[in-house]
Regions:
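Conserved beta-strand signature within the Rossmann-like core of class I S-adenosyl-L-methionine
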Residues: 132-139
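Core SAM-dependent methyltransferase catalytic element
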Residues: 174-196
Length: 196
């Protein structure tokens, strides 16, 4: 997977990817109060299409990705835009978690790439502060798009991993959106439960 995304890094900022990142960014802005107080983890943040606009509003953003080339693009854009409150880490958090916890984790079109959903959700829980939130943007599973998620299943899985206040919405749907087929992009928001 690392090699695949290194290869895509220089062409990743296509009009479609920019459009989808902007959609997710606007949804995050609507969902989260007082972004200026928040320390955010962008998991699998790639070229920074979501992290950089969020950093302009948030207290800080940590962009973590396993692709060195994607991170190079992010760093370059942050320098060009003079964004200082962002750090970049080439790290697999499933193998080497951070000691730091965050108010908010954003995961945009990354979760369907993760081979172990359970381990990934547990890792998100570990990296969130008490009452912290995870925002997952990804594709709805359909007959033609088996890489996505059935929302009820994802919501149930989040509940199993001690998340509550779980809410999902469809942000956008279009032909050719994912792998050449009709697809719908959803946003699911969940809060780390106090019980865990």
């Amino acid at each position: 997977m690392r090699h695949n995304f290194n290869h895509k890094a220089e062409t990743f900022d296509s009009p479609k990817n920019i459009f989808l990142a902007n959609l997710v960014c606007q949804a995050v802005e609507k969902q989260i109060d007082r972004l200026s107080d928040k320390e955010i983890l962008d998991f699998g943040g790639g070229t920074g299409l979501l992290a950089l606009p969020l950093a302009k509003q948030a207290k800080s953003v940590t962009l973590v990705d396993i692709s060195e080339k994607m991170l190079e693009q992010s760093r370059l854009k942050a320098e060009q835009q003079d964004i200082k409150n962002i750090q970049f880490l080439e790290q697999d958090l499933l193998v080497n978690p951070l000691e730091q916890q965050f108010d908010l984790i954003v995961v945009s079109r990354v979760l369907h790439h993760m081979p172990d959903l359970d381990a990934t959700l547990a890792m998100f829980h570990h990296h969130l502060r008490e009452k912290g939130q995870v925002l997952i943007a990804d594709f709805v599973k359909t007959d033609t798009n088996y890489h996505g998620f059935e929302l009820a299943e994802l919501e149930n899985k989040l509940a199993q991993f001690c998340f509550s206040s779980i809410d999902s919405q469809i942000l956008y749907g279009a032909e050719g959106l994912f792998l050449g087929n009709y697809a719908e992009l959803f946003l699911t928001v969940a809060q780390k439960s106090l019980a865990h």
